[in-house]
Amino acid sequence: EPMGFDASQTAVYTGSVPMSISGYSWTEDRAQNYELSDYYYAGENETRQALLIKKENADKYTSPDDLAGQDVGAQNASLQMQLVTEQLTGANPISIGDITVGVMELKSGNIEALAVAYGNAEMIVDANPDLVICTWEFDVKAEYSANVIMMQKGETELLDAVNAILAQAKEANLYDGWYKDAVELG
């Protein structure tokens, strides 16, 4: 069932759906509240996290200090929101429900920057020539550099089945092709 990023987490938490696959990075909070699968390959999309800014501000925002006092958007309940909060301590984190809305907020001047996974940033910039990727990037810890599938806490049988499928996909070297196809579709 298609739903928004933050809504899908709530649906798993309440048991409305058995699991969610939505590019989730591992976080301590998620590990405490959900069953999380083994990591699966997410390409450069998770290993690098970036800030989108208006092209006209490319020289203005080159370090975290430059964003002090500025509104910086990130998707609700995302790794990017965690990174904005932890690494842009002088900025004002603004919760965005959807990346597309975040891009509109950035372009209209309601926020000064938008935190997104690097792969997403590249696709957004390709479609929006008035935006650029900030030269400064977030420092991403190794445990955040891959994705996990989220299940309701206690669903260990489902977790075991999902992990077995992920192991088979890894063994068959399927991730690279899937990732390439997903990027092309994006």
State the predicted function of each range:
Residues A42-K55, E122-L166, L185-G186:
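Periplasmic-binding protein-like
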Residues V12-Y13, L67, L106-K107, I149, ...:
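Hydrophobic residues within well-ordered alpha-helices
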Residues E1-G23:
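Extracytoplasmic small-molecule ligand-binding "clamshell" domains
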Residues L79-T89, V132-F138, A161-G186:
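Ligand-binding clefts/hinges and TM-proximal coupling segments of bilobed small-molecule sensing domains
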Residues E1-G4, A74, A91-D98, E105:
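Short beta-strand-to-loop elements that line the ligand-binding cleft
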Residues I53-D71:
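Flexible hinge/capping segments at coil-to-helix
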Residues S22-N33, L83-E86, E112-E143:
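A ligand-binding cleft/hinge motif common to bilobed small-molecule-binding domains
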Residues A7-V12, G102-E105, I111, N120-A121:
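Short, hydrophobic alpha-helical packing/hinge segments within bilobed ligand-binding/sensory domains
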